């Protein structure tokens, strides 16, 4: 759908970031009520927002801190990650997603937009979601990273993950998605 068609509002409501006015949601065949993003995370959902700088990265934190923050929130304050778990998780996703960074302790704000987006993807993949919502994940990034993200989406879907991929680019949707819905 085009900008302004309600795509982001719809997925934000599904994820619990915004309140839904009406409707029902089923996860694994069971009707659920999602009031907060934490509710969605506990149901196996992950959401990469449209606006990387305003809603995605936490600019003053390191690459490591940005990667582990969602898993730590999902586990809760009474089950903190150890320093080794944090370092191992960050290193795993830096390598897996080929994030170009001097170290895991580099401030995320010093990375390119494409590498920031990969850090956010790593954050959500670390939570081991069943359902990944990607709102304009390739907007404003270089063509190489765009291709890497599209390939990752196809690989995740091949591995059985449900992925909702929102894009304004019809060509990208045709290349990346097995099914499409158009909002007007």
Question: Predicted regions span which residues?
Answer:
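Glycine-rich phosphate-binding loops of nucleotide-dependent enzymes
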Residues: 1-184
């Amino acid at each position: 759908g085009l900008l302004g068609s309600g795509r982001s509002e719809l997925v934000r409501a599904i994820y619990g970031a915004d309140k839904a006015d009406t409707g029902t949601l089923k996860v694994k065949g069971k009707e659920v009520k999602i009031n907060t993003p934490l509710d969605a995370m506990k149901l196996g959902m992950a959401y990469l927002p449209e606006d990387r700088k305003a809603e995605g990265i936490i600019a003053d934190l390191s690459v490591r801190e940005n990667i582990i923050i969602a898993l730590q929130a999902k586990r809760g304050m009474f089950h903190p990650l150890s320093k080794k778990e944090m370092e191992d998780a960050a290193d795993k996703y830096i390598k897996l997603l080929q994030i170009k960074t001097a170290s895991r302790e580099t401030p995320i704000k010093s990375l390119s937009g494409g590498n920031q987006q990969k850090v956010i993807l790593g954050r959500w993949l670390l939570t081991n979601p069943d359902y990944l919502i990607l709102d304009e994940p390739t907007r404003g990034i270089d063509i190489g990273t765009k291709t890497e993200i599209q390939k990752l989406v196809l690989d995740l879907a091949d591995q059985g993950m449900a992925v909702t991929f929102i894009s304004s680019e019809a060509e990208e949707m045709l290349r990346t998605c097995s099914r499409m819905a158009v909002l007007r």
